[in-house]
Amino acid sequence: MKIWVDADACPGPVRDIILRAGQRVKVHTVFVANHALSLPRLAYVSSVQVGAGLDVADRHIAQQAQPGDLAVTQDIPLAALLVPKGVVVLDPRGEVFTEENVAERLSVRNFMQELRESGVTTGGPDGYSAQDRQQFAGALDRELTRLVKTEPK
């Protein structure tokens, strides 16, 4: 099992929570970005710097992630690729993408993108709050605990 982090737009507090959790459960954590990352030198932590370009990090994660892995991303199209592969996907606010909700989330995302492209101002997400951090930490802990228990020995 690995934790895959779409690090290009990962909030700092989320990165810190992931680092601590990965060390606690001794799971290899891979941060993927199209720029150099400054990460602490820790056991179980690595980074992959992919080439520049749209969705290059996403494609790397989609190709490398395996069933039973966990991924953290706010990129809904990436989540839509990972969930059917059996990868547990969390967003930075602690929402778990599932077979039941990922198609709807992708449809809403595409609709909002069409609105923006046609000139409609749609606004952005709320700022990242302490409550978001708590929800993410709780969801990450629950999913990691479940995955570690079900991982073949």
UniProtKB/Swiss-Prot annotation:
Coiled coil: none
Family label: Belongs to the UPF0178 family.
The name this protein goes by in its record: UPF0178 protein MXAN_5526
